Amino acid sequence: MATKTHKSSARRTNKTGIPVRSIPPPPADASAATPQSDAHAPVIERAFGLGPGGLPSEREPHSVERLDGLHSLAGGILESLAPRVIRDLNHELRDRLDKAPLELNSYGYDPWGLNCDVARRTLLVFALFYKYYFRVKAYGLENLPKGRMLIIGNHAGQIAIDASMIGMATVLEADPPRFLRGMGEYWLPTLPFFNVFMARVGGVVGTPKNCVDILHHEEAVIAFPEGVRGMNKPFSERYQLQEFGNGFMRLALQTNTPIVPVAVVGSEEQAISIGNFMPLARLFSMPAFPILLNYFPLPTRYHIYFGEPMEFRGNPNDEDEVIVKKVEQVKGRIHDMIQRGLRQRRSIFF
């Protein structure tokens, strides 16, 4: 009976719902095997949490999804071959994430599937862009409150790089570091493999329930009320704020969460859009498929401004007319910050 159980590799889940492979019994001659520490185990075995002979190690018996293992393997190889500047940045990210207020279980996951090891290797790419490609300048990080907050910003650039750069600013430069939870579009998890990856790096589908749960855990949520309207607008409408949705304000009122307005200057010029190819967008169930003059972003210089927190009181179930007045206050603050940033910058690229 035990042999049948081992052969079928029955899967189980822990309290967070993360699948965990069951651990097979050791071989008969396991007692005679020579011990081998995880530190000297082959990189493939370490990546999948395996000990000598391909068995799950005692230190990490919870071997997770193969995607996580492949990500760890690739990250380990790249880290060993990387120049010193990348290795140093990787260590900096590890230290900063260790200091960030995150609620992780004993397996290293939070309730929404975030894994800091996977996230760190992904953030490393964005950190390189942050420091050396977009050369981001962040202002007003001292305005970030402790505990829960809603970061609300303008959205642009055809590709959601602006969200990544805002997130890198709060991880690399805020004191203490803050890991922002991105509220993704509903269609994103429908992309093959992306749903698991999105969860591992901290992304969450932007449902009201997900947002409320995260805020109740005193975490920081970033949202863009313009949505696709802002991100995919033509170049001729750059830095013109589009209509804001009202959902973020209702969430702020429901959870008594301060709103931090954020203005990004530099994102509008990174990709030049001349239109949308909607037939292809519909084919992939995407809200838009922009036609760009450049599909790799230009090295524009990012300026990110964090404003003072805005607090609102009221009934989250009020009529739209009441909520819109509060939304317009946030939109107006962001508009003023954008205009001030445009006046202050000397060049698009420097």
Whereabouts are the PLM-identified features?
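Low-complexity, intrinsically disordered short peptide segments enriched in small/polar/basic residues
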Residues: 15-20, 41, 295, 307
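Membrane-anchoring hydrophobic helices of lipid-metabolizing enzymes
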Residues: 25-169, 174-180, 184-209, 339-350
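Soluble catalytic domains of membrane acyltransferases
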Residues: 4, 131-320
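Residue-level detector of alpha-helical transmembrane segments in integral membrane proteins
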Residues: 19, 76, 280-283
